[in-house]
Amino acid sequence: MASAAPASSICIKSASCSALAPGRISSLRSVSLPVSRKSFFSRRGSFSLRVNCQAKPETVTKVCNIVKKQLALPDDSDVSGVSKFSALGADSLDTVEIVMGLEEEFGISVEEESAQSIQTVQDAADLIEKLMEKKGH
C-alpha cells in the first residue's frame, strides 16, 4: 500500500503591498521552491514547484474577451486564465485567428514557435506580457 508524503506549507508575506495591484504580494514574477523528500508510492524523489504569475489580471481579462470574440462565444461564457482553447472548441485555425487578434489588440508580433506553445488563456496572457516587456511597454 502506498503512503502519502507528509503535508507541508509555505507562507509568503510582504510588508509593503499597499502600492501593488490587488492580489499581488510583491513585484516578483516567479518563485521556485525545490523540494526533496519521500513522495507518493514510497519512492524517493525530488521535484520543483514553480509558481509563475507574469500576466496582470487586466491582460488576462482582455485575452478572455478576445477569445470569446474570435470563437463567437456568448458574453456570459465562462472563460478564465485556466481555460484551454481546445476545451472552448477552438481548432488550429481558430487558435491562429486568436493569436492574430491578440497581435492586433496589443501591438505585438508573436513568433510561430511561441504561438504553437499557447494552450490556455493564461499562456497567451503570459506571452503577451513577456513580449510587451521586451518591446518596452
From Swiss-Prot:
**In the UniProt record, which is one GO cellular component term?**
chloroplast
Q: Does the keyword Cell division apply?
A: no
Among Gene3D superfamilies, the record links this protein to: ACP-like
PTM note: 4'-phosphopantetheine is transferred from CoA to a specific serine of apo-ACP by acpS. This modification is essential for activity because fatty acids are bound in thioester linkage to the sulfhydryl of the prosthetic group.
Q: Which domain of life is it from?
A: Eukaryota
Ordered alphabetically, the record's keywords are: Chloroplast, Fatty acid biosynthesis, Fatty acid metabolism, Lipid biosynthesis, Lipid metabolism, Phosphopantetheine, Phosphoprotein, Plastid, Transit peptide
What Pfam families has UniProt attached to this entry?
A: PP-binding (PF00550)
Residues with PTM O-(pantetheine 4'-phosphoryl)serine = S92
The protein's GO terms of the molecular function aspect are:
acyl carrier activity
**What is the protein name given in its UniProt record?**
Acyl carrier protein 2, chloroplastic
The gene behind this protein is ACL1.2
